[in-house]
Amino acid sequence: MIAEALAAQKEGWRYTPAAALTGPDFKPAGVPESILPLGGRVLCPVGFHRAALVNGRWEAKHAVLKLPDGVTVEPFSSASGLGDLPNKPAPADMPLAQAASAARDGFVVRVARHARADRPIHLVHISEASSAAESSAARVIVVLEPGATAELVEETLSFGDAPSWKNVRAQVVLGEGAFLRHHRIVREGAQGRLTLGLEVTLASRARYESHALNFGGLFAREDLRVRIEGEGAECALNGLALLGGSEFADHHSVVEHVAVGGTTRQLYKAVIDDKARFVFDGLISVRPGAQKTDAQVYNKNLLLSEDARVNTNPEFKILADDVSCKHGGAVGQMSLEALFYLQSRGIGADEARRLLVYAFGSEMVDRVALEPLKLALADALHGRMPEENF
């Protein structure tokens, strides 16, 4: 069924190796024999509110939720008032999100009108693979009512030597004047696969700030849909992928401006080494009547080997005449002039290369305003620097 659905998406999956998902004989993930503590496993083990899914199931042992009034985090399987939550079917061109819609568990986050989450909310997705290939699905629903504010950190992890696949459908709804800062951190293992379908809707003057950071995994694909429905809404989409070996990452995004005066700023960077591959497809659609739209989409890529590959396609579809829209894509190798400059200052060749790679990636880490997370991401960035003689 999955193979047929992906085969029908010829254009959107043209550069994506679907065999990573259809090749293994995935079985539904079971309950692990033991639940290991999160300490030392998550990237940022600080005093955030926290909830976790293990193999697609809410794990009460990992929940640390002393939430203020007006803020709730519940398991999808037993959340109250599900009938009031978003229930639109997933878009037709997101077949994996359609499949994940049938998931039995996940996270439901709600922030009431003018309420504020006092600390970031950390949602952890963990795959504990057994000796066989296993898959899990999950739902994530985040609703901020008018004037609400929250910071969300989602982290995906996989452990074990067997193939694992997490398939997640997420829906974010921001009411008038609401603000969500949404961090998504991918730290999959050598056999970890992640597919995410994320739909975001913004009402008037709502603000959505996204940071998507990929620190590795065999396969990751994110399909992001943002719909700016209210006047004056703002959307900032930041991303960084650090890939090596035979890793693959694919970022597909569509931002649809429907209302007057919306703003989008998108910048996604990737560092690709060895035989890794990266795909970026970023479309901004400006609908009729969405005058005064101010939108930009850029993708910048740094190749560290002759075998690394990038496919990039930032684009616009504009059906309004009073707009400001800019886009660009770049693929390049390390600057020989910059290398020569650093070496002329007494820095060794390998260290000079690592400094340049770090400088390229650190721009996206520096955009993270949450200080404990920024420090943890900087350490993770150091850990993903190329080895000597690259």
Predicted segments, located by residue:
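Conserved beta-strand/loop scaffold segments within soluble protein domains that form the structured core
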Residues: 50, 60-61, 66-72, 78-347, ...
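Long, low-complexity, mixed-charge
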Residues: 1-87
